[in-house]
């Protein structure tokens, strides 16, 4: 599996593929010290949740005081709320089928990320129903942790490697990817 990019979505895909037994290469166009793109600057995640008890497994040592704080400042955020918010901010341009997939899998994705060792803290600075938690350590920690997990799972990361073009075979299936490297252009072939 070849993954283009090394932000949160890309690293999630890379780790998931490695967990499924695939050999994974991540192509990161940035040098190592700038890796991860905009993930470095993120802090919050929007996901549906039904109760404070849903949030507890995402927060290490979740205290009664933290639970009380969320109960007092936030209301549950349903899948319908999430769906409607995305449709509202996109002015109805989101693909309904893909959006339904996002909405239905957002909380399971959070649980999976927690199983990978990511953690959150209550977000009292921005206590909205849709984002009651913030990343523990922010985006920099999220990014660094993904790279640690990927290394443990055997994911190969190639820095200064920019994906340029997907290469289809005669049947239209993607059979490779053209990549710009410090040494010039190369092609990675897929199976």
What annotation goes with each model-predicted range?
Residues 183-191:
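Core beta-strand elements of the Rossmann-like FAD/NAD(P) dinucleotide-binding domain
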Residues 17:
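Aromatic pocket-lining residues of Rossmann-like dinucleotide-binding sites
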Residues 29-156, 160-165, 172-173:
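Conserved N-terminal/central alpha/beta ligand/cofactor-binding core
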Residues 1-9, 25:
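Beta1/beta-strand and adjacent pyrophosphate-binding region of the FAD-binding site
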């Amino acid at each position: 599996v070849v993954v283009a990019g090394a932000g949160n979505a890309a690293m999630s895909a890379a780790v998931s593929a490695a967990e499924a037994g695939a050999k994974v290469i991540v192509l990161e166009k940035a040098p190592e010290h700038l890796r991860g793109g905009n993930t470095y600057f993120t802090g919050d995640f929007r996901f549906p949740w039904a109760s404070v008890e849903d949030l507890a497994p995402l927060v290490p040592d979740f205290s009664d005081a933290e639970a009380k704080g969320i109960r007092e400042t936030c209301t549950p955020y349903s899948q319908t709320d999430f769906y409607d918010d995305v449709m509202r901010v996109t002015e109805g341009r989101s693909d309904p089928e893909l959006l339904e997939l996002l909405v239905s899998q957002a909380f399971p994705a959070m649980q999976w990320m927690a199983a990978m060792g990511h953690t959150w803290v209550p977000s009292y600075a921005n206590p909205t129903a849709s984002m009651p938690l913030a990343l523990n350590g922010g985006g920099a920690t999220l990014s660094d942790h993904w790279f640690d997990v990927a290394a443990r799972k055997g994911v190969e990361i190639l820095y200064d490697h920019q994906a340029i073009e997907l290469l289809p075979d005669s049947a239209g299936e993607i059979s490779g990817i053209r990549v710009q490297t410090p040494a010039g252009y190369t092609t990675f072939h897929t199976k």
